[in-house]
Protein backbone atom coordinates (compact mmCIF):
# COMPACT_ATOMS: atom_id res chain seq x y z
CA UNK A 1 0.00 0.00 0.00
CA UNK A 2 1.44 3.34 -1.09
CA UNK A 3 0.08 5.86 1.40
CA UNK A 4 1.25 8.95 -0.50
CA UNK A 5 -0.69 8.10 -3.67
CA UNK A 6 -3.44 5.89 -2.21
CA UNK A 7 -2.45 3.06 -4.56
CA UNK A 8 -2.27 -0.69 -4.09
CA UNK A 9 0.79 -2.23 -5.76
CA UNK A 10 0.64 -5.92 -6.68
CA UNK A 11 3.22 -8.30 -8.15
CA UNK A 12 2.56 -11.53 -10.04
CA UNK A 13 4.60 -14.72 -10.16
CA UNK A 14 4.93 -14.18 -13.91
CA UNK A 15 6.95 -11.03 -13.45
CA UNK A 16 4.37 -8.24 -13.74
CA UNK A 17 3.80 -5.19 -11.55
CA UNK A 18 0.25 -3.86 -11.28
CA UNK A 19 -0.86 -0.53 -9.80
CA UNK A 20 -4.48 -0.26 -8.72
CA UNK A 21 -6.76 1.98 -6.69
CA UNK A 22 -9.18 0.31 -4.27
CA UNK A 23 -12.65 1.85 -4.10
CA UNK A 24 -14.51 2.16 -0.82
CA UNK A 25 -18.12 3.04 -0.02
CA UNK A 26 -19.01 3.76 3.61
CA UNK A 27 -15.59 2.31 4.55
CA UNK A 28 -16.41 -1.00 2.84
CA UNK A 29 -14.36 -2.27 -0.11
CA UNK A 30 -16.55 -1.95 -3.21
CA UNK A 31 -14.16 -2.39 -6.13
CA UNK A 32 -10.69 -2.10 -7.59
CA UNK A 33 -9.66 0.21 -10.45
CA UNK A 34 -6.59 -0.79 -12.51
CA UNK A 35 -4.08 2.01 -13.18
CA UNK A 36 -1.25 0.39 -15.16
CA UNK A 37 0.87 -2.76 -15.51
CA UNK A 38 4.56 -3.20 -16.29
CA UNK A 39 6.96 -6.09 -16.82
CA UNK A 40 9.77 -6.48 -14.31
CA UNK A 41 13.11 -6.06 -16.08
CA UNK A 42 16.64 -7.15 -15.30
CA UNK A 43 19.54 -4.71 -14.98
CA UNK A 44 20.10 -4.85 -18.75
CA UNK A 45 16.45 -4.03 -19.49
CA UNK A 46 15.46 -7.57 -20.44
CA UNK A 47 11.96 -8.60 -19.24
CA UNK A 48 12.09 -11.34 -16.62
CA UNK A 49 10.72 -14.67 -17.81
CA UNK A 50 10.29 -18.25 -16.63
CA UNK A 51 11.72 -19.17 -13.24
CA UNK A 52 13.51 -15.79 -13.06
CA UNK A 53 10.11 -14.03 -13.02
CA UNK A 54 8.64 -15.91 -10.01
CA UNK A 55 8.01 -12.84 -7.85
CA UNK A 56 6.39 -13.52 -4.48
CA UNK A 57 6.47 -10.52 -2.14
CA UNK A 58 6.64 -6.75 -2.40
CA UNK A 59 7.74 -4.01 0.01
CA UNK A 60 7.75 -0.27 -0.67
CA UNK A 61 10.23 2.42 0.27
CA UNK A 62 9.60 6.22 0.30
CA UNK A 63 5.86 5.47 0.09
CA UNK A 64 4.75 7.66 3.02
CA UNK A 65 7.16 10.61 2.86
CA UNK A 66 4.64 13.04 1.37
CA UNK A 67 6.48 13.12 -1.94
CA UNK A 68 4.99 11.59 -5.07
CA UNK A 69 7.07 9.82 -7.68
CA UNK A 70 10.01 8.55 -5.60
CA UNK A 71 8.61 5.19 -4.44
CA UNK A 72 10.94 2.19 -4.75
CA UNK A 73 9.79 -1.41 -4.79
CA UNK A 74 11.68 -4.29 -3.20
CA UNK A 75 10.63 -7.61 -4.73
CA UNK A 76 11.51 -11.10 -3.49
CA UNK A 77 11.67 -14.08 -5.84
CA UNK A 78 11.40 -17.86 -5.46
CA UNK A 79 13.17 -20.64 -7.34
CA UNK A 80 16.08 -18.26 -8.02
CA UNK A 81 16.00 -16.99 -4.41
CA UNK A 82 16.87 -13.28 -4.49
CA UNK A 83 15.78 -9.70 -3.77
CA UNK A 84 15.86 -6.82 -6.20
CA UNK A 85 14.88 -3.14 -6.24
CA UNK A 86 12.68 -1.69 -8.98
CA UNK A 87 10.94 1.51 -10.03
CA UNK A 88 7.13 1.37 -10.35
CA UNK A 89 7.57 0.99 -14.13
CA UNK A 90 9.49 -2.27 -13.64
CA UNK A 91 12.96 -0.83 -14.30
CA UNK A 92 15.65 -2.43 -12.14
CA UNK A 93 17.47 -0.08 -9.76
CA UNK A 94 20.25 -2.43 -8.63
CA UNK A 95 21.71 -5.89 -9.05
CA UNK A 96 19.92 -8.69 -7.17
CA UNK A 97 20.79 -9.64 -3.59
CA UNK A 98 20.92 -13.31 -2.60
CA UNK A 99 20.59 -13.58 1.19
CA UNK A 100 22.51 -16.43 2.78
CA UNK A 101 19.54 -17.04 5.10
CA UNK A 102 17.49 -18.27 2.13
CA UNK A 103 19.97 -21.10 1.58
CA UNK A 104 18.28 -24.42 2.17
CA UNK A 105 14.81 -23.23 1.13
CA UNK A 106 13.00 -25.50 -1.32
CA UNK A 107 12.65 -24.10 -4.84
CA UNK A 108 9.03 -23.02 -4.40
CA UNK A 109 9.14 -22.40 -0.62
CA UNK A 110 11.44 -19.38 -0.41
CA UNK A 111 11.10 -15.71 0.54
CA UNK A 112 7.32 -15.60 0.37
CA UNK A 113 6.92 -12.89 3.03
CA UNK A 114 8.55 -9.48 3.41
CA UNK A 115 7.92 -6.13 5.08
CA UNK A 116 9.79 -3.13 6.41
CA UNK A 117 10.05 -2.86 10.21
CA UNK A 118 10.69 0.57 11.80
CA UNK A 119 13.62 -0.76 13.86
CA UNK A 120 14.97 -3.77 11.97
CA UNK A 121 14.50 -2.63 8.36
CA UNK A 122 13.53 -5.32 5.88
CA UNK A 123 12.28 -8.50 7.56
CA UNK A 124 11.82 -11.55 5.36
CA UNK A 125 10.18 -14.90 6.02
CA UNK A 126 10.59 -18.27 4.34
CA UNK A 127 7.31 -19.94 3.41
CA UNK A 128 8.14 -23.35 4.88
CA UNK A 129 10.89 -24.92 7.00
CA UNK A 130 14.22 -24.78 5.15
CA UNK A 131 16.73 -27.61 5.25
CA UNK A 132 18.07 -28.17 8.77
CA UNK A 133 15.16 -26.46 10.55
CA UNK A 134 12.64 -28.33 12.70
CA UNK A 135 9.27 -29.28 11.18
CA UNK A 136 6.49 -26.72 11.79
CA UNK A 137 9.10 -23.97 12.19
CA UNK A 138 10.47 -21.53 9.65
CA UNK A 139 12.83 -18.58 9.59
CA UNK A 140 12.43 -14.80 9.77
CA UNK A 141 15.53 -12.73 9.08
CA UNK A 142 16.94 -9.33 8.19
CA UNK A 143 19.59 -8.50 5.61
CA UNK A 144 21.99 -8.18 8.53
CA UNK A 145 22.67 -11.04 10.93
CA UNK A 146 19.34 -11.19 12.79
CA UNK A 147 17.28 -14.39 12.64
CA UNK A 148 14.15 -15.51 14.49
CA UNK A 149 12.58 -18.95 14.80
CA UNK A 150 8.95 -18.72 13.68
CA UNK A 151 6.61 -21.56 14.76
CA UNK A 152 3.89 -22.06 12.17
CA UNK A 153 0.22 -22.24 13.13
CA UNK A 154 -1.31 -25.54 14.24
CA UNK A 155 -3.44 -26.47 11.17
CA UNK A 156 -1.83 -29.16 9.01
CA UNK A 157 0.09 -27.73 6.06
CA UNK A 158 0.45 -24.21 7.48
CA UNK A 159 2.88 -22.01 5.56
CA UNK A 160 3.89 -18.36 5.94
CA UNK A 161 2.65 -16.33 2.96
CA UNK A 162 3.06 -12.66 3.91
CA UNK A 163 4.14 -10.11 6.52
CA UNK A 164 3.14 -6.49 7.05
CA UNK A 165 4.19 -4.00 9.71
CA UNK A 166 1.77 -2.76 12.37
CA UNK A 167 3.69 -0.24 14.47
CA UNK A 168 6.58 -2.14 16.08
CA UNK A 169 4.75 -5.45 15.61
CA UNK A 170 4.39 -7.58 12.51
CA UNK A 171 1.22 -9.15 11.19
CA UNK A 172 1.67 -12.55 9.55
CA UNK A 173 -0.60 -14.30 7.07
CA UNK A 174 -0.55 -18.09 6.93
CA UNK A 175 -2.27 -20.57 4.63
CA UNK A 176 -2.89 -24.22 5.52
CA UNK A 177 -3.65 -26.31 2.44
CA UNK A 178 -3.59 -30.07 2.98
CA UNK A 179 -6.55 -31.80 1.28
CA UNK A 180 -8.83 -33.38 2.32
CA UNK A 181 -8.53 -31.11 5.38
CA UNK A 182 -10.29 -27.72 5.07
CA UNK A 183 -8.37 -24.69 3.81
CA UNK A 184 -7.43 -22.52 6.81
CA UNK A 185 -6.18 -18.92 6.73
CA UNK A 186 -4.58 -17.57 9.92
CA UNK A 187 -3.79 -13.97 10.84
CA UNK A 188 -1.18 -13.66 13.60
CA UNK A 189 0.64 -10.90 15.47
CA UNK A 190 4.42 -11.14 15.97
CA UNK A 191 6.44 -9.25 18.55
CA UNK A 192 10.11 -9.55 17.72
CA UNK A 193 12.40 -10.08 20.71
CA UNK A 194 16.12 -10.60 21.04
CA UNK A 195 16.94 -13.01 18.19
CA UNK A 196 16.00 -15.81 17.92
CA UNK A 197 13.08 -15.20 20.32
CA UNK A 198 9.65 -13.81 19.43
CA UNK A 199 6.08 -13.84 20.73
CA UNK A 200 3.13 -14.83 18.56
CA UNK A 201 -0.60 -14.28 19.05
CA UNK A 202 -3.18 -15.75 16.67
CA UNK A 203 -5.70 -12.98 15.99
CA UNK A 204 -8.08 -14.84 13.68
CA UNK A 205 -8.39 -18.19 11.95
CA UNK A 206 -10.78 -18.75 9.04
CA UNK A 207 -11.63 -22.28 7.87
CA UNK A 208 -13.44 -23.26 4.69
CA UNK A 209 -15.00 -25.98 6.82
CA UNK A 210 -16.90 -23.26 8.69
CA UNK A 211 -18.32 -21.79 5.49
CA UNK A 212 -15.78 -18.99 4.90
CA UNK A 213 -15.28 -18.07 1.23
CA UNK A 214 -11.52 -18.53 1.02
CA UNK A 215 -8.82 -19.13 -1.55
CA UNK A 216 -5.02 -19.16 -1.75
CA UNK A 217 -4.42 -16.02 0.36
CA UNK A 218 -0.85 -14.80 -0.20
CA UNK A 219 -0.95 -10.99 0.00
CA UNK A 220 -1.38 -8.75 3.05
CA UNK A 221 -1.00 -5.00 3.55
CA UNK A 222 -2.10 -2.47 6.14
CA UNK A 223 -3.93 0.71 5.16
CA UNK A 224 -3.23 4.00 6.91
CA UNK A 225 -6.34 3.66 9.11
CA UNK A 226 -5.46 0.13 10.27
CA UNK A 227 -7.70 -1.81 7.91
CA UNK A 228 -6.08 -4.80 6.22
CA UNK A 229 -6.24 -5.90 2.59
CA UNK A 230 -5.76 -9.61 1.85
CA UNK A 231 -5.18 -10.88 -1.69
CA UNK A 232 -5.32 -14.42 -3.08
CA UNK A 233 -3.34 -16.05 -5.90
CA UNK A 234 -5.49 -18.06 -8.31
CA UNK A 235 -2.49 -20.16 -9.47
CA UNK A 236 -3.65 -19.54 -13.07
CA UNK A 237 -6.35 -22.15 -12.42
CA UNK A 238 -9.93 -21.83 -13.74
CA UNK A 239 -11.05 -23.52 -10.52
CA UNK A 240 -9.64 -20.74 -8.31
CA UNK A 241 -10.25 -17.01 -7.90
CA UNK A 242 -8.23 -13.91 -7.22
CA UNK A 243 -9.95 -12.39 -4.20
CA UNK A 244 -9.34 -9.02 -2.54
CA UNK A 245 -10.68 -8.87 1.01
CA UNK A 246 -10.78 -5.96 3.47
CA UNK A 247 -10.71 -6.61 7.23
CA UNK A 248 -11.04 -4.16 10.09
CA UNK A 249 -9.27 -5.40 13.25
CA UNK A 250 -11.22 -5.01 16.47
Model-derived features: positions:
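Sequence/structural signature of beta-propeller domains
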Residues: 1-250
Amino acid sequence: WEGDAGLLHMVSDRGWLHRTRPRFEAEHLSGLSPIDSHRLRDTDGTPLEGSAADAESLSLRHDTNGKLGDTELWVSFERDHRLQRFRPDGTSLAAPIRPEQATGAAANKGMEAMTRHPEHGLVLGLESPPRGVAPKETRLFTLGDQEWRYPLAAPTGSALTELTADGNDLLALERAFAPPAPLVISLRRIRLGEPPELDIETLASFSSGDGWWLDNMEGLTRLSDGRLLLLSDDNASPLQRSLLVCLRPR
